[in-house]
């Protein structure tokens, strides 16, 4: 009886994974067909530039003005992005998932090609780590709303460009957000080391 139940469970799990994969590729195919590629290219590029540029600009300004609280904020935001990208790239090369345009060249049109594996989305992880850490640091609606919309736009852009599955983007968002919250505790220790 145990073997029958185990066999049924294995078949059900396999069927659920096939269904999830179908949802993933069907969503990419649909979103990839939307003609928003210029906007997506802009969002996608900003997802690589802003997560580095914002904390760097904050840090440089803080050093020039000798503003230690701002420098602490820059360190928190910058280390959050670094942590998110570290986790993301460790997973990317451990899992080594093919990009949608490589696995389904007849169904997905790549707007831009990438050299790294697909899962999870590094651009999305970086965008959500920046958006979440900014929102935690400056909890005002005029910081939270635009940064959240921008991060979601980066995730959408990666699917629209055909370079990621929705599961890549969702996992990247979870990693980026999670690193921002985890880094609150890590930076308490780091602030003692750097600033006291």
Question: Where in this protein do the model-derived segments appear?
Answer:
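N-terminal transmembrane-helix/juxtamembrane module of multi-pass inner/ER membrane proteins
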Residues: 16-58, 72, 89-116
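Bacterial Sec-dependent N-terminal signal peptides
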Residues: 1-23
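Interfacial segments of alpha-helical transmembrane regions
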Residues: 63-86
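Membrane-water interface at transmembrane helix exits
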Residues: 15, 61, 88-96, 135, ...
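Membrane-embedded catalytic cores of phosphoryl/pyrophosphoryl-handling enzymes
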Residues: 105-196
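Short helix-capping/hinge motifs at transmembrane helix termini and TM-loop junctions
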Residues: 64-66, 95-96, 139, 162
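Small-polar-interrupted transmembrane alpha-helices in polytopic inner-membrane proteins
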Residues: 79-93, 144-157
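Juxtamembrane loop-transmembrane helix junctions in multi-pass integral membrane proteins
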Residues: 35-42, 69, 135-138, 142
